[in-house]
Structure formats: C-alpha cells, structure tokens
Amino acid sequence: MTHQLLKGKRGIIFGALDAASIAWKTAEAVHEAGGTFVLTNAPVALRMGTINELGEKTNAPIIPADATNTEDLNQLIEQAVEQLGGKLDFVLHSIGMSINVRKGKHYTDLNYDWLTKGWDVSAVSFHKLMQALYKKDAMNEWGSIVALSYIAAQRTFPNYNDMADNKAYLESIARSFGYFFGKEKKVRVNTISQSPTLTTAGKGVKGLNGFLRYAEKTAPLGNATASECADYTVMLFSDYTRKVTLQNLFHDGGFSFVGVSQDIIDELDELDETAS
C-alpha cells in the first residue's frame, strides 16, 4: 500500500509483540500510509518481543503500559498526545490472552482466577482504554478505534476455550461504548473478526494448524493474512469509512458465511472411498 490515506493522522497501536503479530503489520502499514503513532504493550511483553526494531523502522516512540491498569492508560494517553503533537485519530487494540488455553485447561474445568485475568486483559482492557480516551477527550472527531476479534465470539470452536467468551464481551463493549463515543464525540468504534492467523499468541490454541487448513478450504477467497488485516485496519482508520461504526466486520475470505465448502465434501468423499 502506497496511498497516504493516514497522512497527518496520529494514534496509538497496542499489542505489537513480534513481526508475526497483526499489530506489528498494522504499524508498518500505518507508517506507509503516512500516519504517526505511539507503540505500546505491557512491560513483560516488551521484554519478550522485539518491538524496538519496529519503533526504529517506523520512527515510533515506545511507551510501556499495562492495559488493565487505568493509571497506566491515563499516563499513556497523556504522553501520546504530547509526543505526537495533538489529539488522536486512531487506536488499535490488539491484545488477548488466556492462561487456561496456555495451560491446557479444558473448558469444562476452567481455573476461574485465570479466567478473570484473561477476561481483564482481553476484553475489559478495551473498556478501560475507551473510558480513558473518552474522559480525557483525547480523540479527534471522526477518529477510529478498532479492536481485533474472532468468529469464536459467535460460533463454537471448542479449542478456543474461554478466549471465545473474552471475544464475545469485547465485541459487546465495542457496540455499547461505541454508541456513546459516536453520539457525543463522533468517534467510530468497530471490531474486526479476522481469519485464524498464525501469530505467537495464536500458536497456543490446540489444533490451530489443522484449523488453518480447514478454514483455507472453506473460505472462497482463502484465509486473510496478517498483512491483509493490517491493510483493512488502515482503511477503517481512514476518512473513507467515516460512517462505519458499531460493526463487527468479518475479514475472513468469506469463511463466516459458508456452511460447508465443496473442497471439504470432496475430501470426505475421497476418505469414504478409500475406507471402502
């Protein structure tokens, strides 16, 4: 993408961990589109990842912040507005985690302390972020806030575990807070329901590789990549989508509206023939 769709626009990008992450790809795409931004992640994530490389590549300041901590968020927003030279035009929330998934706990045997922690990081942090932005009047009119979701918020994907609940709440927060942000401040709030993507976080989901192949065979256009999601996010940040808000937008090659693909049927027929 070479169009300067975001020239003169300022923002914050949450969640860039490494080059495989969607937030990382989005930062690169926003930079290419002319936008300036602050990169942020939790201090522990900053130590684990390679975000300094991204900061140098995109000329973006890096400000550590725990997205579950309201004091951190307030300080982050204040510093971002100061360093970028004005109110914000876009924010990306690309944060999610489940200790239950990481530890292999089955959905029928969840650890509730872990559930609460994942809930706070993956979903409640989005409300805390928007509340801080709202109270500080930190967004310009016609600004755009985007969070990344997944179809498991609406359909059953057993191995996605309690992350499905987290994403469902995330989408609900986007609609509920998005109403007030739109009505009172003309700020857009949307979620993107992205194809399964082989990110560092996604690798923790059991059976992901098999599901990636299944989704690729099901989606008429194939799975959307992290880079393609980044381009889509740039479009949502741009002025071309000024009247798009409160939406959960499927960016999945058509997977979300296919019952079963002919490729899958043909594959099952072949297995039946082999078995007989």
Please provide the spans of the model-predicted regions:
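Conserved mid-core alpha-helix of short-chain dehydrogenase/reductase
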Residues: 72-75, 117-132, 228, 235, ...
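A glycine/serine/threonine-rich, flexible loop-to-helix segment
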Residues: 52-53, 184, 191-219, 259-276
